[in-house]
Amino acid sequence: MKIAIGCDHIVTDTKMEVSQHLKAQGHEVIDVGTYDFTRTHYPIFGKKVGEKVASGEADLGVCICGTGVGISNAANKVPGVRTALVRDMTSALYSKEELNANVVSFGGKVAGELFIFDIVDAFIKAEYKPTEENKKLIAKINHLEAHNDNQANPHFFDEFLEKWDKGKYHD
């Protein structure tokens, strides 16, 4: 299976561990960054993971930031993406089996690596169980998506990147 993975600078080490775990399971990993601990922002990488999944380049996605909240929100803004921020096995399975989630998100400072491994494995193995009710609910969710020209704009985050390049952000 092809799995896109992305993170912000706070949890690059966790992302690399998850990436290695996925590769050891035989999955092809599409790592969209970030690749080091240089300060950056989660929306860039949530969007990139979402785009890989929505385009079909990846079957599923994994997003990780400090809490998981921001990066999951960013990924969810990509049309066709249903991201679940999970902190337990029940939520992970429910999101895939009932809501047909295609991206799972974590807080790397909230959940430990071994726990993330278990949830990612279960999420990948779980299968969507379509019912008339959940198909209708998913269709309603999909109807909420409206095209926005910024979604396809590769320069959407340039103003922030310019500030980072000038050293205006500090941890």
Swiss-Prot record:
The entry's keywords: Isomerase, Lactose metabolism
Top-level enzyme category: isomerase
Alphabetized Pfam families for the sequence: LacAB_rpiB
Catalytic activity: aldehydo-D-galactose 6-phosphate = keto-D-tagatose 6-phosphate
GO biological process terms held by the UniProt record: D-allose catabolic process; galactose catabolic process; lactose catabolic process via tagatose-6-phosphate; pentose-phosphate shunt, non-oxidative branch
Entry-linked SUPFAM superfamilies: Ribose/Galactose isomerase RpiB/AlsB (SSF89623)
Any GO MF annotation of the entry: ribose-5-phosphate isomerase activity
Record pathway: Carbohydrate metabolism; D-galactose 6-phosphate degradation; D-tagatose 6-phosphate from D-galactose 6-phosphate: step 1/1
Keyword NAD carried by entry: no
EC number, as in UniProt: 5.3.1.26
Subunit description: Heteromultimeric protein consisting of LacA and LacB.
Family note: Belongs to the LacAB/RpiB family.
Stored PANTHER family: DNA DAMAGE-REPAIR_TOLERATION PROTEIN DRT102 (PTHR30345:SF0), RIBOSE-5-PHOSPHATE ISOMERASE B (PTHR30345)
Name of the protein: Galactose-6-phosphate isomerase subunit LacB
Organism: Staphylococcus haemolyticus (strain JCSC1435)
